[in-house]
């Protein structure tokens, strides 16, 4: 069975050949990522937020090292911080929250609220992207120098961590929402 993410049913119907504004295009991507990310964050039971894979999780024939692997909660904290960071670059302003305050959150409730707030801030940033400024260079990050590219990277970066979180769910016997 396929979920909304696999079928594309989360996006509104558009007429092929219709011109979209940069913000509409970016919002489409961010909305899908937000829905999927928040879905996996909500799906993990609160008592499993401290879960991280270890060598003991796998067969003895595997020799991978797991030092420094983030817990499920730390994955949420990382993406939340990144959302604020990348969105602040689009807006050309200082991050409105201290990253250390996000990293200190430990409960599911706190982390879900922080993540939701970071997505709201990202939507605020995307709302400032216009046809005129989408590809004007900004003080970007890691070689990303336009609002449009940084906006796309919010989702691209987040999906990397979303994929890890999906595996954490499965390791704990939880079917990810996108697979239902």
Language model feature labels by segment:
Residues 16-51:
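N-terminal targeting signals for Sec/Tat export/insertion, comprising classic cleavable signal peptides
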Residues 104-137, 149-161:
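Acidic/histidine-rich alpha-helical segments that form the ligand environment
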Residues 1-11:
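Bacterial Sec-dependent N-terminal signal peptides
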Residues 27, 35-38, 52-100, 139-180:
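Short, contiguous alpha-helical
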Residues 10-22, 92-104:
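Acidic/histidine-rich, surface-exposed loop or edge segments in extracytoplasmic proteins
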Residues 42-51, 126-135, 170-177:
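Surface-exposed helix-capping loop/turn segments at secondary-structure junctions
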């Amino acid at each position: 069975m396929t979920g909304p993410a696999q079928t594309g049913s989360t996006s509104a119907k558009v007429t092929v050949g219709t011109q979209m504004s940069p913000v509409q295009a970016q919002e489409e991507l961010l909305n899908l990522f937000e829905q999927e990310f928040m879905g996996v964050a909500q799906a993990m039971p609160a008592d499993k937020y401290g879960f991280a894979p270890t060598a003991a999780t796998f067969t003895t024939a595997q020799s991978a090292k797991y030092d420094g692997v983030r817990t499920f909660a730390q994955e949420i904290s990382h993406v939340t911080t990144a959302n604020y960071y990348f969105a602040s670059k689009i807006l050309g302003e200082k991050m409105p929250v201290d990253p250390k305050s996000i990293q200190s959150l430990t409960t599911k409730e706190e982390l879900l609220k922080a993540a939701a707030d970071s997505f709201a801030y990202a939507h605020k940033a995307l709302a400032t992207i216009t046809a005129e400024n989408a590809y004007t260079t900004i003080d970007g990050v890691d070689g990303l120098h336009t609002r449009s590219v940084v906006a796309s990277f919010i989702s691209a970066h987040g999906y990397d961590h979303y994929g890890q979180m999906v595996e954490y769910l499965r390791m704990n016997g939880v079917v990810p929402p996108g697979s239902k």
